[in-house]
Amino acid sequence: MNMNLPDVTSKQLTTASLPLKWVGMEGIALPITLAEQPSSSLSAKANVFVSLDKADAKGIHMSRLYLRLKESLTNEPLTMGALTALLQTLVSSQEGLSLAARLQLDFELTIRKPALLSGQFGYQTYPVSIRCEYINEKMNTELSLSIPYSSTCPCSAALSRQAMSDAIATQFSEESVSKEALLTWISSQQGSVATPHSQRSFAYLKLQLQHNELPDFSALIKNFEDVIGTPVQTAVKREDEQAFAKLNAENLMFCEDAARRLKQALENNEKISDYWFKVEHQESLHAHNAVVIDHKFPQGYDKL
């Protein structure tokens, strides 16, 4: 039906014979399915590119990228095999114009999370990004995650304890103190002498995986949350909120503490070949953030 329609890309040559690194599309809406949640469809946005290596070609066959993307990822769960086959197909679809392809998939993963004590549960979403490059017949993959957590300042906690100690000394000046009177005072509003500052904090991670294998995303996120120790909550009742307060007291953290916990977990994970991360504590005491940035190798992170 299209045989008589003009094809400018195939028939016309460019006036400037120069190759171009990447040509493609961004923000393509696409439903995808993860192997760990095969019955659920996720809404993703895809960025897809190929190299334009034929210097005198007018442009790439862009519609072929869209069609190959749609055909490949909407019909089967997302696996490394499926991604590799797709990028190879993207290159071959250009019929000699391209030697390399790249793909980025951005989506939010929804995870069911139980409350700490009450038996309630809720849902939390986590931004996930998968970047793939197929260059020189080699596939490289990068995974990006954003994980929120709670952090309470150790210095502020110590100052709060000192303030409480001073207040008790002032309130109960006698040598001996009635246990009942002390507990009554602590439980009253007067007993709220000082509270340490805490804040919502974030770990941003970029990971390159051994053998380019896609992980179980939910399990990987939970592992990092367990390592840090203070994951944010969803549905809570009073007993959950109290348990969360205790959890924060047991895990007082400067940004350096959180970063070291995360780094140790990354170093111990044999499936991760390279990493970059940023820990960000969005301070409630200050108008600025406390930040740590680190990567695996001294020469830096080889990002895609």
Whereabouts are the PLM-identified features?
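N-terminal intrinsically disordered, cationic/polar leader segments
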Residues: M1-L304
